[in-house]
C-alpha cells in the first residue's frame, strides 16, 4: 500500500504544473474589471471644448481596466445625476456635448462605469473622476466702465490718480490672471480737441497686476487739459501668442491751479508764456492844464490773470518819483483808469516815474506784478531840428562798460549830426541834447553812440537787440527833431552760470537694487545762447556714503536710485550744473527713505524657470529651487497654484525647493508647467512659471515636416551644382539623439548636404532626356542605435527654350461644306519640346484669298465661302515662323475636300404641253412624264423626287411617280364631269434645305359614252407593274439627316415631319411591314413615331418650351421583320429647332431696399431740380429677341386722390429711369402713388404682354433724415457696402430704408459751429412705414425704440471691414448763406413799356443828385486843403509804445529784472505800407504844409468835434508801420471779398476818450451811441481788423478805418504764433460766417446773441463771470496761452513773438 500510494518524481512534477495552470486561470479571471493602477477609482483629464468641438481625447485615452471590452468584459457608463456627458467607444470616452469650464464652473465630472465579466457575470462599479482642464478662451472684461478722473495740474510725479481699474477673466489659473498696461493710442484718437493728447508716457501703471495709474511726467493745464489713456487688460496664458486682451479708455481731465502771476498786456510787449516782460506805460499832460482821464500809451493800463481762474485785478501805485506824484495823479483800483487830479507845472516836475501794481483778488496767495508808468509834462514845442546818423545798425558786446562805443558792421563808431532848417548858415549852432528812447545807450557831446548802462544783458529775458529812436532837442527852446530809428545788437558772452532751481525734500520708499527708480529731476537754466547755454549735470557729493546709490543723467538731470535703500536713511545729494565755459552752480536735494505701505509683492529672481528631470528620478529628489525677494523684506511663502493636477511635485513653503513626490512617466506626459506663487505677509503676491522637461532615451524617429511633404522641387536644365531645394526633418529627442544627417541614393545625378539637407545637382541635366526625377531622402539621428526617417522627393527639370516647333502629323484631310464663310476648317498643332513653347503659325502655301491661319491657336478658317462646283479640293501648306525648315515635321499639309451642299433647286428639262385623255383610260395609265435634273454634285442634293401639289380635284384623280416624274391616272375620270384639270407637279430634291420647282400640267378629259359590254375592269393593274427589282438594296431612309423648325406653341399629337422610306411597299389594309424607333434624344418622351405608307411620321406628344430647351437632336433606326433593311442606311438623325414665341410676361425686379411685394418706394426733396434721377425700375422677360425687349410707361392710378401724379415725373422708355419733371417746393400732397407698366415685344401693342407695379413717392424733409456714424472709416471706404448698411437698418427697424447719401462726418463744436471730419462718415438715411407708405419722423416712437434708445443703439455696433457703426443722430450740414433770388415775372405787354420809362426817370433823378453831391463835396475838400495850408500851430510831442517782441524759450523761465524803456509817440498819419522798419521822409513832395500842421490828439479837440485835425486826414504820410511777423503766417487774415484795399487813411483821426455813451472802445464814438468797431491807432493795416458787417452795428460810414463797404464779417482766431488753428472758422467767398472755437480753453468767445452787443471794454460793466466780452473787431485773440478776445484788443492778432527784437517807436 505504501508503495502503491507513493508518487514517482515524474508524477510529482506533473501535478505541480497542473496546480500552476489552475492558479493562473483563477487569478486571470479575478483580474477582469480591475483597475490597472490598483486604485479604487479612475482619474482622467480632458480639456474644455473650444466653442462646439467635442472631439478632444482624455488623458490617458482609454480607461485603465483589465479585460477586452469586446470579448472579456462589458462596460456601461452610469450617470447618477443629470444627462450623460460621455459615451463609450471601446474603452475610450467620447464627449456627447461641448464642455465649458468657465460658464458652468465645471472643474470635474463624476460618474461611474459598470464593468461585467462576461465569463462569470460578475459585475463591478468603478467611480470615474474626469478633471476638466482650462484653456484660454475668454478675454478679460473691464468692469464699471467708462473710467474718468480729474486731477489738478500740481499733482506730483509718482502720485496714484486712479485705482478703480478692474477686469475679470473667466478662465482659471494663469489664463485668468489679469495684468494691465498703458498702450500708445491711435493717431486719430487725440486729434478731436485742441488741448487733448494721448496719455501714453505721461501716465504709467507701475504694477501691472494692480492696475493703479500714476503720474509719470509733470502736468501743465495750459498745454494739455485732457489726456486719453488706452488701458489694455491681458491675461497671462503660458503661450504669449494665445494671450487675449481687451482695451478701454481712461479719460484724465486736468484741473487748473493758481500758479501764474497776473500780467500787464498791451500792444508790442515782449511776452513770455503769455506774460509781458518789463511792461512800460507813458502818458503826457500839458503844463498848467487839467485833463481828467489821461490817455495812456501804448494802450490803457490793463492786467489779466494768466490762470483760467480769472481772478479780479486790483490796481494801485506802488511808488513813484517825485514823491508828490499822488497829489496830481490817481488810478482806479478796479479798472486801471489813470486820472489827473491837479494841474501840474513844468517848474514842479517835468516827468513822473510811477510803479503801477496789479494784484489778484483771490483767497490764496496774493500774486501781483508791476509796471513802469512815465508821465511827461509837456512844454511848448518849436520847429524841430533834423538828425542823421552814420549807420542805422550797430554792434557791441554784452556787459560792456559804460562809455564803450557802438560800432557799425565795418568797425567804425556810430556818430550823429543834427541840423535845423530854421537856422541860417551864419546863425550859431546850438548844443543839442540827444534823447534816446532807451536808457541803455547815450550820445556823447561829440555825437558818438556809447553804452550808457552797466551789465547790458543779451540773455533772456533781456531783448538782446535794442531798437530805439533818437531825438535831438534844443535845450533852450525844447524843440525836438523827428525821430531817428537805430538798432543795436548785443553780442553774446559766456557770462551766466547755470542756475539750478530749488528742489523740495523728496521722500522715497525703501527698495532693492533690482529696479532703478526715479527720485526727481533737476533743471538748470543758462541765459547764454548757443554752445554757452549747454548744461551738463553731475553729482558733486552725497552724504551718508550714498555716492554709489544714486546716478544722474548728465543731459536730462534725472536722479535715479541704483542701490538698496533702507527705511530711515537720509541722504543729501549735492547736484552741480556746469556750462561749457566751466561756470557752475549747485543745489542740494534732500532724500528721505520711508518704509511706506506694503505696495510691492515679492519678486521672483526669474519669471520663468526651465528645468529638466529624468523620468527615473527618485521620489523626494530635488528638481530645482526658486527664490523670491520681498522689497519690504517680509517673509515669503511658496505654493503651487496651477499645473500640478497629478500631484507629482511639491514645493517647500519656506525654502522654495521643488521635489518629486510621485514616479514620472515620460510616455504619459513629457512636460509640466507649474505656476508658483510667492506671497508676503501682507497678502501681496506674484507668480513665476516653472517649465519641467522630462528627459528620455532615444525612442523617436526623425520626422520630416508634414506640411512640406511630399517634396517637389524645380531646377533648370544644363546647370551643375545648382541648388534644387532643402529638406528638413526634426527629431523629438534631444542632444546627440536629435542630430540629423541626410543621405540620398548614389545612382542619381544629385548630391545632398548631410547637415543642412540642401540638395544640389551633381551634373548638368537635360530636360529632353528626362524631365522628372523621383528618389527617397533618408534622415538618420546621431544616437548609437540610430533611427531613420524617409521622405520622397520629386525634382522637376525646367526646360530652356532650345527647341523649334515640330508637327507630329505630315498631313490632315478634312471635309468642309461649301458656301460657309469664317468656317473652322481645322486646327493644326505643332509641338515645342520646350516647357514654355513659342509657336506662331503661318500659311506657307495655298490660296490666301480663301483661307487664313490664326497665329496663336493654329485655327484654319475660310475667308469666304467655297464652291464645290468650282473646285472640289484645296491643299494648304502650314508652317511656323520659329521653324523655317522644309524637312519632315517642319510643315503640315492640310487637304481640304469641299462637301457639296444643296444650293441648286431641281429644274424641269422641258415645259410640259397640255395632255388630252379619254375618261375610259384605266387607272395607272401614264399620261405624261415631266423629268427634272438637279445641278448639285452629290446625293441626296441631286436626287429628284416628284409630287402633286394641287390644284382643285387634280390630286384626287392623278398621281405622279416620285422617282420618275411619270403622271398616272389615279381614279376613274368618269366620276367627275370636269373636262379640264390643272395638275401642278413639284420636283424637289432630298437635300437640306430642301429645294424645289413647280411645273403646271393641263389635262383635258374627253368623256365617252359608257357601254355595258365594254365595261372597264378595274382589277388591280398596278400589281403587274410593280415588280420589286429594287428589293436588292433593301429598305432605307431617304437621307442621313433631317432638319425641321417647329414653333413652341404647336399642339400635342401634331405631325412634325414625314420621314420617307426608300423601296417601301404599300401595305394595303394592314400595317406597314417596317417600323421606326428612337435610338437617342427622346429621353423625356416628348416625341413619338408612327409607321405609314412609304415613311414614318414624327409626332409631338408633349408641349415645347423655347425657354427651357431650344433644340432637340434625335437618332432614329429602321427595322423590318419581313423585308431586308440596308444596314448602311438604317439610321438617320433629325434636328428639331424650336422657334421662340411670346409666351412670357415681363416680371419686375423689386429691390429689397426700395420695393416691397409689388411696390417701388422713392423720395424727392424741395431743393430737387428738374430732370433729377430718383429711381430706376427693372423688369425682365424670359423670351428672346424682340419678345424679350421691355419698354416702360407711366399710368395714373384710378383710385389716387391726387390728380395726375404722373405729371410730376417722366420715365425713360428704354431704361426705366424715373426723373422729376417739376419742382416740389410748393407741393405738399404726398405720398404720390402711380403705376409703371412694363410691356414686351419691344413695346408693340399687338401680341405683347404687360405687367404693372406701383410707385410711391414721398417728400423728404429734415425731420425724416437720420445719420448713421462711422468714426473710423472715410466715405470712400464704405462706397461698396450699401447693401450691408441698408440690411442693418431694415433688420433693426422692420421698415423700408433708403440711403440718401454718404458724406464726411460733421459734429457740433462747443461754440455751435459745424466741424467736418473727412476721416469719418455720416450715412444719411430715411425710413418708410410699409403700412402707411409714408416717411417716418425721426421723433417717431418706433425710431426711438429701435434706434435711439441706449439698448437698441448698442446693437448697432456691428462691424463692416475696417469700419464700425457708432450711433445714430440727426444729420448736420453747413448752412450756406446764399440767398437765391428767383423772380417770377409775368410780363404784361401793355404795362411793361411804362414800367421801363418810370425806372429810367428814377435813375436820371438819382444820378443828377449824386453829381451835385460830388461837386459840393469836392468844393468843400478844396477849401479844407486851403485852410490846412494856412493853418499852423505848435504841439508837444506824443509818446508811442515800446513793442517788445519776444517768445519765451522755455516754460520755466520767469520774468525778472524787467527793463524800463522811455517811449515817445509822434501822432502822424501812417499808411499801410509793407516796410519792416520805421522810416521818416521829410522830402518836399510829401509835405503840402509845414511841420506845424501836425496836430496831436487831445481829449478836448475830439470830444467837441472841433479843433485841429489829426494828420491822419492828410496826404503827408511820414511813417510806416511794420507788421512784425515770425513765421510769415497770416495772423490778421482777411477773408472778405475785397482783398486789396490800399487805404492810406488806415489810422483813425479819433482820440482816446471816455465817452458816457455805450461805446465798446474809446477809440470809436459814432453819433448814435451804438457799438462801433474797435479802432487800433496806427497799427492794424488790414480792413478786417476794424469793422463789423455793414448794417449790423450802425457803423459810422465816414470813418476811414471802419471799412463800411466790407461785405463780410470775419471771426478769426489768432494764436501766439499767428497760426489759424483747425477749429477756426473762415469766411468763404459766399459771405458765409463760420464761427470758430477759439482760445486756449476752446470756449466760444465770438458768441452773438440776437442783436445785442455785449460790453467789450472792461472799463464798463465788466463781470468776471460773463464770458461774452467780445472783441469789437470780432477777432478772438490768443495771446500767448491765453484768450484775450474778451478784452477788446484787436492788435494782438498781429503780434509775433520774436525772440531777440525790441522795437521802440517814437
UniProtKB/Swiss-Prot annotation:
Mind telling me what this protein is named? Answer: Cadherin-99C
This chain's source organism reads: Drosophila melanogaster
- Please report the record's description of how this protein sits within the membrane: Single-pass type I membrane protein
**Which SMART domains does UniProt cross-reference here?**
CA
Q: Where in the cell is it found?
A: Apical cell membrane; Endosome membrane; Cell projection, Microvillus membrane
The domain of life for this entry's organism is Eukaryota
What spans does the record annotate as topological domain Cytoplasmic, numbered to this chain?
1417-1706
Upregulation details from the record are:
Up-regulated in the adult anterior midgut after the ingestion of bacterial uracil. Strong up-regulation detected 1 hour, 2 hours and 16 hours after ingestion, whereas no up-regulation was detected at 4 hours.
Q: What does this protein do?
A: Cadherin that functions in epithelial morphogenesis and the intestine epithelial immune response. Essential for female fertility. Regulates the length and organization of apical microvilli in developing follicle cells and salivary glands. Function in the follicle cell is essential for egg development as the microvilli secrete eggshell material such as the vitelline membrane. Acts at least in part by regulating the recruitment of the myosin ck to the follicle cell microvilli.
